[in-house]
A protein has these predicted regions:
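Short amphipathic alpha-helix used as the core "switch/output" element in two-component signaling
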Residues: 41, 63-75
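Active-site residues of response regulator receiver
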Residues: 54, 82
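Acidic, metal-coordinating helix/loop segments flanking the phosphotransfer/catalytic sites
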Residues: 32-50
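Helix-turn-helix DNA-binding segment
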Residues: 144-176
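Conserved acidic segment of CheY-like receiver
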Residues: 1-13, 17-21, 150
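Acidic catalytic/metal-coordinating carboxylates
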Residues: 35-38, 60-64, 85
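Short, flexible helix-to-coil linker/hinge segments that flank and couple to helix-turn-helix
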Residues: 88-95, 100-152, 156
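Receiver (REC) domain active-site loop signature in two-component systems and cognate sites
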Residues: 57
Length: 176
């Protein structure tokens, strides 16, 4: 039997997930928390195998709660279930100690599959999120300055231009 803790600041979300999991053989919702602090306390004092954690909550959010739970109760597996799927967040969450990452738009069967996978010791990342993470490694977003790719000489010329100096063929200015 897989004991699951639901953590979300929206009662309606918790009730919906609870309802989905009620009918699943081998999975039992053993508790709920509406904030990260309560989730951390709950995991330290109760038997829980898997935590379905929301990212954005009052107080400490899902990322910090994941760090704290992963540090203090290594046997508890955490799945981030969130609307925030853009990079670099999934990687940060996994580095913080989560075993899984799902979008709140996931199908109920995918949530069940994720719970079973992380309980068995595997990691689970929704395929669309995993693809996005992989692509960001191949094609990192252009976040550095456009001047970062200039040679030292090209940078000197750019600085001269910004100071209003004429560059032309003046070898004295360019120190050729």
């Amino acid at each position: 039997l897989i004991n699951v803790l639901l953590v979300d600041d929206h009662e309606l979300v918790r009730a919906g997930i609870r309802r989905i999991l009620e009918d699943i053989k081998g999975i039992k919702v053993v508790g709920e928390a509406s904030c990260g602090e309560d989730a951390v306390k709950w995991c330290r004092t109760n038997a829980v195998d898997v935590v379905l954690m929301d990212m954005s909550m009052p107080g400490i959010g899902g990322l910090e709660a994941t760090r704290k739970i992963a540090r203090s109760t290594a046997d508890v597996k955490i799945i981030m279930l969130t609307v925030h799927t853009e990079n670099p967040l999934p990687a940060k969450v996994m580095q913080a100690g989560a075993a899984g990452y799902l979008s709140k738009g996931a199908a109920p069967q995918e949530v069940v599959s994720a719970i079973r996978s992380v309980y068995s010791g595997q990691r689970y990342i929704a395929s669309d999120i995993a693809q996005q993470m992989a692509l960001s490694q191949i094609e990192p977003e252009k976040t550095e300055s456009p001047f970062a790719s200039l040679s030292e000489r090209e940078l000197q010329i750019m600085l001269m231009i910004t100071k209003g100096q004429k560059v032309g063929n003046d070898s004295n200015l360019l120190i050729v």
